[in-house]
């Protein structure tokens, strides 16, 4: 009968491991503690790219958080304005180099009405151009001996006419196109007829209105060119601009009236 092999305690060839002895157990080399003065063969490398990426991500997160906070404050401001006054506040975005008004035809005007709105916008820019050039022409006439009073009157026309035309007829048309409001369309037609009448009078420039030479109409141009050729040329250019603005305004009025009748 075979017996299981029992270790011989008196056998010197076998190594006895006493678990209770100090340091008696075999410890793998990888898990042994590093003694004082012992050098490490392996070094830990931390790539700089990862550090740069993490800093960039932190900056992006900070920028994103700031932008979200700004939008949240803007939305809160609008909600407070609507709740208090019932009026929606639009961000100023035009002109791009110095925003003073909100203007976004592509996003706020229906697609089928955008062409008409662009035509009306061209008409408004046209009257601004006419009034600004009118100031330049009267300044040339003043330099050539025409008197300073006509220059000051032309400056007043420009300072009042440019914002007034926007408030009285262009902005109401813009809102009428957005909301399809018959009341706003009616106000636009009334004020736009006054605008057309002013353009026609300015193109003629009778001496009984606006102190004669303060507008670059045809009668004023004929009178000025006899005294100064250069000033007369400027006046005739201004006369042509007022004529083009009058024709464009009549065309815009016809187009918008047909659009209004077609929608109603």
From Swiss-Prot:
Coiled coil: 51-85
TM helices/strands, residue ranges: 123-143, 150-170, 185-205, 233-253
Disulfide bonds: none
Membrane topology designation: Multi-pass membrane protein
Cytoplasmic compartment spans: 1-122, 254-264
Keywords: Cell membrane, Coiled coil, Cytoplasmic vesicle, Membrane, Transmembrane, Transmembrane helix, Transport
UniProt KW Cell wall biogenesis/degradation keyword: no
Region feature Disordered, mapped onto this chain: 1-33
Organism superkingdom: Eukaryota
Localisation per UniProt entry: Cell membrane; Cytoplasmic vesicle, Secretory vesicle membrane
Transmembrane helix is among the record's keywords: yes
GO cellular component, one term: plasma membrane
Alphabetical GO biological process terms: protein transport
One Pfam family this sequence matches: SCAMP
Cross-referenced InterPro entries: SCAMP
Family stated for the protein in its record: Belongs to the SCAMP family.
Function as written in the Swiss-Prot or TrEMBL entry: Probably involved in membrane trafficking.
Name of the protein described by the UniProt record: Secretory carrier-associated membrane protein 4
């Amino acid at each position: 009968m075979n017996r299981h092999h029992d270790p011989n305690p008196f056998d010197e060839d076998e190594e006895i491991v006493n678990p209770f002895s100090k340091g008696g157990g075999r410890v793998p080399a990888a898990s042994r503690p590093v003694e004082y003065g012992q050098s490490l063969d392996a070094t830990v490398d931390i790539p700089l790219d990862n550090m740069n990426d993490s800093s960039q991500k932190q900056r992006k997160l900070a920028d994103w958080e700031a932008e979200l906070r700004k939008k949240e404050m803007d939305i809160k401001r609008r909600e407070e304005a609507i709740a208090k006054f019932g009026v929606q506040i639009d961000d100023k975005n035009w002109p791009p180099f110095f925003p003073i008004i909100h203007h976004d035809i592509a996003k706020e005007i229906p697609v089928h009405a955008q062409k008409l709105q662009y035509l009306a916008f061209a008409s408004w820019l046209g009257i601004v151009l006419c009034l600004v050039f009118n100031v330049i022409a009267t300044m040339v006439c003043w330099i050539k001996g025409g008197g300073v009073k006509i220059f000051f009157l032309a400056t007043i026309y420009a300072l009042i006419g440019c914002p007034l035309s926007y408030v009285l007829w262009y902005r109401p048309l813009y809102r009428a196109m957005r909301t399809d409001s018959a009341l706003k369309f009616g106000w636009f037609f009334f004020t736009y007829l006054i605008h057309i009448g002013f353009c026609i009078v300015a193109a003629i420039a009778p001496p009984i209105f606006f102190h004669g030479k303060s507008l670059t109409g045809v009668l004023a141009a004929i009178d000025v060119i006899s005294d100064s050729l250069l000033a007369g040329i400027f006046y005739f250019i201004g006369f042509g601009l007022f004529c083009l603005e009058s024709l464009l305004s009549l065309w815009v009025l016809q187009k918008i009236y047909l659009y209004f009748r077609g929608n109603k």
